[in-house]
Amino acid sequence: MAKLTKKQKALEGKVDAQKLHGVDEAIKLVRELATAKFDETLEIAMNLGVDPRHADQMVRGVVTLPAGTGKDVKVAVFARGDNAEKALAAGADKVGAEDLMEDMLAGNLDYGRVIATPDMMGIVGRLGKTLGPKGLMPNPKLGTVTPNVAEAVKAAKGGQIEFRVEKVGIIHAGLGKLSFGEEKLRQNFDAFVDAIVKAKPAGAKGKYVRKVALSSSMGPGVKVDTAELTGA
């Protein structure tokens, strides 16, 4: 086990593993507990009352964090002609067709979002085994297969994130850098939780949002009182 720093030891007693905190209190505590020498991310883990092995209990979608993510998201776009030019003008990092496919098959996958126009899906379809496991496969339900590539690129660069429930019913996401301050982090928290609540599937049974915890990239988890969450 790694040795605790003096600051970590001093803060260790501040976290009661069983205590439920209000959202504002939890965000403040996470920021106080951050000890890394870099600008850590506020991370959320939500335990949902769903079993994603059943199609009618899948939770997946996109949400725009009003204060952004604090990250530079690299975006690749499959498009030709006028759409390719629009994607580049909107800030896409890489735009192409067969050439982009070959580049990705060669292992160049350093992207946070992959977007495609509908007519390019014949090419993109060949990348299913390459992009699928990384969660990068363009999907019309997520707005990443679209004729409006410029809007999709701007959304990806402007704080839009994708979410998807994992096998055990948990959703993880980053809600921005701790340096954003408590007010902006709260705005991002509210937007994310609201999106998850609205994405409640028809097959969900019993209590939907069961547990919520916040932490910094390297810090301990702080439990949030779900009674404070609207619609949860």
From Swiss-Prot:
GO terms for biological process: regulation of translation; translation. GO terms for cellular component: cytosolic large ribosomal subunit. One of its GO terms (molecular function) is structural constituent of ribosome. InterPro entries: Ribosom_uL1_bac-type, Ribosomal_uL1, Ribosomal_uL1-like, Ribosomal_uL1/biogenesis, Ribosomal_uL1_3-a/b-sand, Ribosomal_uL1_CS. SUPFAM superfamilies: Ribosomal protein L1. It comes from the Bacteria. Keywords: Repressor, Ribonucleoprotein, Ribosomal protein, RNA-binding, rRNA-binding, Translation regulation, tRNA-binding. Binds directly to 23S rRNA. The L1 stalk is quite mobile in the ribosome, and is involved in E site tRNA release. Protein L1 is also a translational repressor protein, it controls the translation of the L11 operon by binding to its mRNA. Belongs to the universal ribosomal protein uL1 family. NCBIfam families: rplA_bact (TIGR01169). HAMAP family: Ribosomal_uL1_B. Part of the 50S ribosomal subunit. This is Large ribosomal subunit protein uL1.
